[in-house]
Amino acid sequence: MNGLTATGVTVGICAGLWQLVSSHVGLSQGWELLGTIGFVAFCSFYAAGGGKSGFIRSLAVNYSGMVWAFFAALTAGWLASVSGLSAFWASVITTVPFSAVVVWQGRFWLLSFIPGGFLGMTLFFASGMNWTVTLLGFLAGNCVGVISEYGGQKLSEATTKRDGY
């Protein structure tokens, strides 16, 4: 079986297992987005190129996006309190520099998968800035990516004909 087909099989199996596990955990209050965050991280792993470097880059930039989102929220709160702006307008204003930083950090190899930073920001905000569920969701999803890729490689090796047999 070629590598892409084998990886497709293992991705499907891993996605199904992730859905099973995360949907049960997601029944607990505050954990509703665990499945979504994990699936996005799963995609982020492959989009960052897969393998060891894809895992490292994806996870690092997902986490950096969370940190920038946290600082953006703190800055928006501060700006609203000192300026009299509404929280909405303070958030709009602080989105500009913190979004730019996510792009600018891309000059560094570890943070060069720029979309991953925006995924981290977005899902951290979507979770209500829940550090635990977002950190664990990104870690689990990237790990599921590694497992599915490795499984695909092993399945391909086990099912590929060798020496003409």
UniProtKB/Swiss-Prot annotation:
Locations listed in the record: Cell membrane
Pfam family, one: DUF1097
Principal localisation: membrane
Transmembrane spans: 30-50, 65-85, 86-106, 108-128, 131-151
Coiled coil: none
Protein topology in the membrane: Multi-pass membrane protein
Keywords: Cell membrane, Membrane, Transmembrane, Transmembrane helix
Gene Ontology CC, one term: plasma membrane
Presence of keyword Cell inner membrane: no
InterPro entries, per database record: DUF1097
Top-level division of the source organism's lineage: Bacteria
Family per similarity comment: To E.coli YcdZ.
Designated name of the protein: Uncharacterized protein YahC
Lineage: Bacteria, Pseudomonadati, Pseudomonadota, Gammaproteobacteria, Enterobacterales
